[in-house]
From Swiss-Prot:
Keywords: DNA damage, DNA repair, DNA-binding, Glycosidase, Hydrolase, Lyase, Metal-binding, Multifunctional enzyme, Zinc, Zinc-finger. This is Formamidopyrimidine-DNA glycosylase. Binds 1 zinc ion per subunit. GO terms for molecular function: 8-oxo-7,8-dihydroguanine DNA N-glycosylase activity; class I DNA-(apurinic or apyrimidinic site) endonuclease activity; damaged DNA binding; zinc ion binding. It comes from the Bacteria. InterPro entries: DNA_glyclase/AP_lyase_DNA-bd, DNA_glyclase_Znf_dom_DNA_BS, Formamido-pyr_DNA_Glyclase, FPG_cat, MutM-like_N-ter, Ribosomal_uS13-like_H2TH, Znf_DNA_glyclase/AP_lyase, Znf_FPG/IleRS.
């Protein structure tokens, strides 16, 4: 599932290329996504001038002169540029044909993605208004985390995946951040010691920064006009590595289900 680093990489790759372009046509091939596409989408979008592409948590905001298209990539979604002559595939559900030689294409094999148009402030949309701070911004600090977690008797992993607490952290990077911080994912949020607040905040910022930088170094692949083969290769320390040796101590990485999600941890390094 694309999380904050993958979404930020798309923003950095695609945003500068579409800024200043006008939507001259749309091709809608499937309307039944997580939220059904409005039948008047073509009328709303044709003629719109794109002014910026922003990100909020895991959402992409394609800001136009008259409103904003809100994208969520779901489990398998991708937003990328293709050449105007590029044939569409089975799972390419929306094309925004731009003036010039490119199409902004949304593909989503499992159809859990979201495409919504709003002519109001997108940050006040029901999908976004309750989001907590961005994890890479100064507002997300050790003192902030303490205020949000010290009375919560839920596993710390579930807390940091709550977008109302902090925006954009999904299962993959929650696993990676807790491993870097040396904190067991099942630890009750209320039981975390104050010194661990700083460790965890620093770990989250570090893991996400490393992943974004890995994506930025591979950003050219999003601009070739060819169908992408997947997201950038970021070398995970622990996610998806059940039974393999811990990169810190060599003991076997374990997996459990926590909040219905696969959770990977080292029983020796994470306490």
């Amino acid at each position: 599932m694309p999380e904050l680093p993958e979404v930020e990489t798309i923003r950095r790759a695609v945003g500068p290329q579409v800024r200043g372009k006008r939507i001259i046509h749309t091709n809608v091939r499937a309307t039944k996504l997580r939220h059904p596409l409005p039948p008047e989408l073509d009328r709303l979008l044709v003629g719109q001038l794109i002014v910026a592409m922003d990100r909020r948590g895991k959402y992409l905001l394609l800001r136009c002169k008259g409103g904003t298209i809100i994208f969520h990539l779901g489990m398998t979604g991708m937003l990328y540029l293709v050449k105007a002559s590029s044939p569409h595939g089975k799972h390419d559900h929306l094309d925004l044909v731009l003036d010039g030689s490119y199409i902004l294409r949304f593909t989503d094999p499992r159809r859990f993605g979201t495409i919504i148009w709003t002519d109001n402030d997108p940050l006040q949309h029901p999908l976004l208004v309750a989001h907590g701070p961005e994890p890479l911004e100064a507002e997300f600090s050790a003192s902030y985390l303490y205020l949000k977690r010290h009375r919560r008797k839920i596993p710390i992993k579930q807390l940091i995946m709550d977008s109302r607490v902090v925006a954009g952290i999904g299962n993959i990077y929650a696993n990676e951040s807790l491993f870097r911080a040396g904190i067991a994912p099942q630890t009750s949020a209320s039981d975390l010691s104050p010194d661990k607040d700083l460790l965890l905040v620093d770990a989250i910022k570090g893991v996400l920064t490393d992943a974004v930088e890995a994506g930025t170094s591979n950003i050219e692949s999003a601009l070739t006009g060819e169908r992408p083969q997947g997201y950038f290769p970021y070398e995970f320390s622990i996610y998806g590595k059940k039974g393999r040796p811990c990169p810190k101590c060599g003991s076997a990485i374990r997996m459990m289900r926590l909040g219905g999600r696969s959770t990977f941890f080292c029983p020796l390094c994470q306490k």
